Amino acid sequence: MKMSAEQISEVLKEGELEKRSDNLLQFWKRKTCVLTTDSLNIYADTQKRTKSKELKLQSIKKVDCVERTGKFVYFTIVTTDNKEIDFRCSGDDNCWNAVITMALIDFQNRKAIQDFKTRQDDESGSPGQHESRMARAP
């Protein structure tokens, strides 16, 4: 899956992460990942020729369980439907969890501002509602 020029300009981090498989044996599989301002794209190969799995930031609740061992940094992404996805990266490249967390915070802030502006526009577009709300205020 090719990324558009717009997506490429929004890349926050690109590199390798290991993802723990969901099957019974739970092997760690190396994945090429691209974090943008809106999603974490996970590819099976380094050339990004395979179709990516896109984990939208709006579907991520938090980055949790950060643990550092001698060789790896382990962390878990918890989705809004409470699914847990385990990742690890080498200790040399230990800022993946921080960059994902910061991207998530930035995304949530942008969404909150957008929601606030939408609410404000809705209220300013109908002054009758605003007056009736003020009339109810003590």
Curated annotation (Swiss-Prot):
Localization in the cell: Cytoplasm; Membrane
GO biological process: positive regulation of apoptotic process
Protein name in the entry: Pleckstrin homology-like domain family A member 2
Job description of the protein: Plays a role in regulating placenta growth. May act via its PH domain that competes with other PH domain-containing proteins, thereby preventing their binding to membrane lipids.
Pfam families: PH (PF00169)
A Gene Ontology cellular-component term: membrane
A GO molecular function held by the record: phosphatidylinositol phosphate binding
Chief place where the protein resides: cytoplasm
Domain PH: 11-105
